[in-house]
């Protein structure tokens, strides 16, 4: 984390998200403060808590993407949840503590991936030995000389153990050398693969306890294996992953996952405006109950998970909402106070759409060009055509519902629909997208307000 200053974090975010400078600065400062906190005296460190962020802005302007890219940048555990999925304690539905359990699971996957990468060489060496075992076994079972089939039953010409061991060692040495030289990649072998246990209850509402029980039973019960016939090339990554899993110190992984979730975890609470209350009708009371349930998690509490107790005191919470029908002040005062940093995100303009289409590392135009390029159809967009697409997106957003940058996906699909359908049967060709090409396919629909509501 210490590698990135706030300015560098903003520059990294600029590679993926256009505009929204205030939001980027806010999350960059919050992230840097985490690093600063680690440098403090331990007695003071526990007193410094993250300053949670409330993002206010319409859909499709980059709220979620900023948080997701931020987490990816520093390899922090990240989970996105929707406030509307939760119900008040005592009702059927997901309880708010499940967001912390989800974060720990995300942290566990992150730590496991890192540990497996570090163990990859050792795991691959063990996997190669298993492949050699399979190859030697296959050679032995087919018989070297194809002699009398009754020899196996009566042992008439069985070799002495010393000779058998020497021959096996010689065989293994030859096969190992051929394997490392890549001569046996297409050879078929029989390997025993551990069957993955089906997670019956994961993600189901109200089933967290049963998921924990299933996990405990899975550790006690013997693991099932299934024999599969694969080529050496196909078997190697499967066996390597299996061996890496065995080499993991699960206690160490669990401890690190919990530590990272507590100290670096980011929870993105979307649609928080939907649980804001105005009146005191029954629905309003229920939504207020959800807010009061979320409050202790954000304030700092301990949640019991199957990996041990997890403290939420130093997790960073980023809440977001459009706040069309409600205001931030409609949230209960205690919850408002837990999100001291408020950032308003701007609606996207025509110029923003042009930048979104062209500037990010994996810009939308680059994606479509690559997709069609896979069929040897090479597409180029003129600058005027890009401007035309951006203009139509801004126009439709203004005249109908404003869905931000997601409007570009709809329009791009309409523009390239015919080409995408025909590309597989076309010879290698170059296609230039002009403003007229764009207007021929979406112009009439964009201009007709009734049609654009249903189609774009």
Swiss-Prot record:
The keyword Nucleotide-binding applies. Belongs to the ClpX chaperone family. HslU subfamily. The keyword ATP-binding applies. HAMAP family: HslU. This is ATP-dependent protease ATPase subunit HslU. Its main location: cytoplasm. PANTHER family: ATP-DEPENDENT CLP PROTEASE ATP-BINDING SUBUNIT CLPX-LIKE, MITOCHONDRIAL-RELATED (PTHR48102), ATP-DEPENDENT PROTEASE ATPASE SUBUNIT HSLU (PTHR48102:SF3). It comes from Exiguobacterium sibiricum (strain DSM 17290 / CCUG 55495 / CIP 109462 / JCM 13490 / 255-15). It is found in: Cytoplasm.
């Amino acid at each position: 984390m210490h590698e990135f200053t706030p300015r560098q974090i903003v520059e990294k975010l600029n590679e993926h998200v256009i505009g929204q400078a205030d939001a980027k600065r806010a999350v960059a400062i919050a992230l840097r403060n985490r690093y600063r906190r680690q440098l403090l005296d331990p007695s003071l460190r526990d007193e410094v808590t993250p300053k949670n962020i409330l993002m206010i802005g319409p859909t499709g302007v980059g709220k979620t993407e900023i948080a997701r890219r931020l987490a990816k940048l520093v390899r922090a555990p990240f989970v996105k949840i929707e406030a509307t999925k939760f119900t008040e304690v005592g009702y059927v539905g997901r309880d708010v503590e499940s967001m912390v359990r989800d974060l720990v699971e995300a942290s566990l996957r992150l730590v496991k991936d890192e540990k497996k990468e570090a163990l990859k060489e050792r795991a691959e060496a063990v996997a190669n030995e298993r492949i050699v075992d399979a190859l030697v076994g296959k050679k032995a079972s087919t018989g070297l000389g194809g002699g009398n089939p009754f020899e196996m039953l009566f042992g008439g010409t069985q070799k002495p153990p010393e000779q058998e061991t020497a021959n096996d060692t010689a065989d293994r040495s030859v096969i190992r050398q051929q394997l490392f030289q890549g001569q046996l990649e297409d050879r078929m072998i029989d390997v025993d693969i551990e069957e993955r246990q089906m997670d019956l209850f994961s993600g189901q509402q109200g089933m967290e306890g049963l998921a924990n029980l299933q996990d405990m039973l899975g550790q006690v019960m013997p693991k099932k294996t299934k024999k599969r016939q694969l080529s050496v090339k196909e078997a190697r990554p499967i066996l390597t992953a299996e061996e890496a899993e065995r080499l993991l110190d699960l206690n160490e992984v669990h401890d690190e996952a919990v530590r990272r979730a507590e100290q670096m975890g980011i929870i993105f609470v979307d649609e928080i405006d939907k649980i804001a209350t105005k009146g005191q009708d029954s629905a309003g009371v229920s939504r207020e109950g959800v807010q009061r349930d979320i409050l202790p998690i954000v304030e700092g509490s301990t949640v019991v998970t199957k990996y041990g107790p997890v403290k939420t005191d130093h997790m960073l919470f980023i809440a977001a909402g459009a706040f069309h029908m409600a205001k931030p002040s409609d949230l209960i005062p205690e919850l408002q106070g837990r999100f001291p940093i408020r950032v308003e995100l701007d609606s996207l303009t025509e110029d923003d759409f042009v930048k979104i289409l062209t500037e990010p590392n994996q810009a939308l135009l680059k994606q479509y060009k690559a997709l069609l390029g896979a069929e040897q159809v090479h597409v180029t967009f003129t600058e005027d055509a890009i401007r035309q697409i951006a203009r139509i997106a801004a126009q439709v957003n203004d005249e109908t519902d404003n869905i931000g940058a997601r409007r570009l996906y709809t329009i791009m699909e309409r523009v390239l629909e015919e080409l995408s359908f025909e590309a597989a049967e076309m010879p290698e060709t170059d296609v230039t997208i002009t403003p007229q090409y764009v207007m021929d396919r979406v112009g009439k629909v964009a201009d007709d307000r009734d049609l654009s509501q249903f189609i774009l």
